[in-house]
């Protein structure tokens, strides 16, 4: 699914210990978040009812100054079993490409730091 962000914001370890990426879309939103110490990543699309907690090891991601790509790893039996056992909505969260206005180098570095925190928790800090 390709999405185009009108606006995006991010936070790294705010006062509540939350790191998050928020993408405002033309007709909705997409957000990824993780609390410090939490094992799972929360993904939410357009409605809190669509939110799901997912092990970040289920994903591979890539980002550059104009897009963020998120894919569920589908060639790993352990991941596939986890997705099935936890009733993960792979239709909604299986493959997402978010396009956004080009970022400056400092913005990209800040976005990269938040993304590392989301997917690796405290491992890299």
Question: At which residue positions do the language-model features occur?
Answer:
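Charge-rich, low-complexity N-terminal segments
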Residues: 1-31
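Generic detection of short hydrophobic beta-strand segments and adjacent strand-loop junctions
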Residues: 3, 10-14, 43, 52, ...
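A generic structural signal for beta-strand entry/edge sites
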Residues: 16-20, 29, 38, 58, ...
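Generic "edge-of-domain/loop-turn" microfeature
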Residues: 28-30, 37-39, 77, 105, ...
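Amphipathic protein-protein interaction modules
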Residues: 49-109, 113
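C-terminal partner/receptor-binding element of secreted or periplasmic proteins
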Residues: 110-123
């Amino acid at each position: 699914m390709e999405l185009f962000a009108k606006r995006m914001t991010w936070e790294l370890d705010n006062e509540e210990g939350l790191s998050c990426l928020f993408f405002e879309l033309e007709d909705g939103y997409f957000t990824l978040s993780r609390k410090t110490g939490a094992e799972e990543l929360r993904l939410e699309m357009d409605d809190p009812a669509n939110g799901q907690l997912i092990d970040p090891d289920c994903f591979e991601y890539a980002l550059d100054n104009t897009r963020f790509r998120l894919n569920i790893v589908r060639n790993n039996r352990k991941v596939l079993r986890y997705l099935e056992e936890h009733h993960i909505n792979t239709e909604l969260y299986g493959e997402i490409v978010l396009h956004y206005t080009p970022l400056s180098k400092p913005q990209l570095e800040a976005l990269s730091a938040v993304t590392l925190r989301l997917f690796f928790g405290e491992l890299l800090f």
